[in-house]
Amino acid sequence: MSHFAAIAPPFYSHVRALQNLAQELVARGHRVTFIQQYDIKHLIDSETIGFHSVGTDSHPPGALTRVLHLAAHPLGPSMLKLINEMARTTDMLCRELPQAFNDLAVDGVIVDQMEPAGALVAEALGLPFISVACALPLNREPDMPLAVMPFEYGTSDAARERYAASEKIYDWLMRRHDRVIAEHSHRMGLAPRQKLHQCFSPLAQISQLVPELDFPRKALPACFHAVGPLRETHAPSTSSSRYFTSSEKPRIFASLGTLQGHRYGLFKTIVKACEEIDGQLLLAHCGRLTDSQCEELARSRHTQVVDFADQSAALSQAQLAITHGGMNTVLDAINYRTPLLALPLAFDQPGVASRIVYHGIGKRASRFTTSHALARQMRSLLTNVDFQQRMAKIQTALRLAGGTMAAADIIEQVMCTGQPVLSGSGYATAL
């Protein structure tokens, strides 16, 4: 049995996806230890998974609060500050992980695509590592918009020029992080590199996004595996919570995720739009609103405001999901064929929203939209059965992709052979 280190950026959705994968590996007899700054310890709620804190000098307890605040407001100067914090974390991990891997006697490393330090250190120490895309894959292709870009997919010269120009702007913004990657690659004696997408595993790359939900890709590596959602494999069945009282009024679930749930003004717009169509609204703010804000929103008829909801239960009962475009929420909605109205706010959410529209499984709107315009889009989604019908193909693809168990099989195969695991190959699981 193997001992894996898990390296993720300090954000809930990324840690949660890797924790679900870690739990499956633990159930198979392996050990998994997350290694990061102290503050992400509270994000790991499984007693069977280890945690090893590093970087207390530069990232002391409480330091993550500032990073999460920047991530919740990632526009203008805050974006550059957030990128600088990402660079600081990668720098810290590149310095701390070699000793941690040796002290913990790590056999292999599971690395989120967004945190390259785990990949660099694993390669330098000769450890096998597996890259995981918990959000949109960051793999680049010449005629494909970057994951963070809001563009529709196109093959015209104008589209390709737009993609290329936006890539240059993105690379300029990320230059501080790029310098950290380049400096540590040189210090460790690795082949020159400076960008995230140059740090992915040559053995296996795992993605939650299936091709049926992506733009047409032509240049993914042979070791790239689209396994679908990384969910708990030994989780209890969906709760019996009933969130909607009427079967006659439209049932709408709205959530902006764990980082963006503070957007009271946007929630007010959603509430007004639901009033206009006389819909029932379940609004989950993930603990980000004040009591007075919750009370004000809940004054609206047929509106429930909660910190957290059982998302699977809510989406299985809802007829429409209003979301920021987070990968996990979108995949859950597809699983229940619940049409999507995306209000992308940051990170890869514009890219996810573009894919929702491209595949005809929902609509997108600006965060500055009016309640009347939002209501008009909601009516279209609720009355046009084509959205649900188009979801059926993607739903089937997600359920056949293999999920967490397939990802664990791939990881075990890497550890068993030390060779690249090619897409479509059988996965040996006995170690």
UniProtKB/Swiss-Prot annotation:
It is an enzyme of class 2 (transferase). One of its GO terms (molecular function) is UDP-glycosyltransferase activity. GO terms for biological process: carotenoid biosynthetic process. It catalyses: all-trans-zeaxanthin + 2 UDP-alpha-D-glucose = zeaxanthin bis(beta-D-glucoside) + 2 UDP + 2 H(+). Belongs to the UDP-glycosyltransferase family. PANTHER family: EG:EG0003.4 PROTEIN-RELATED, FI06409P-RELATED. This is Zeaxanthin glucosyltransferase.
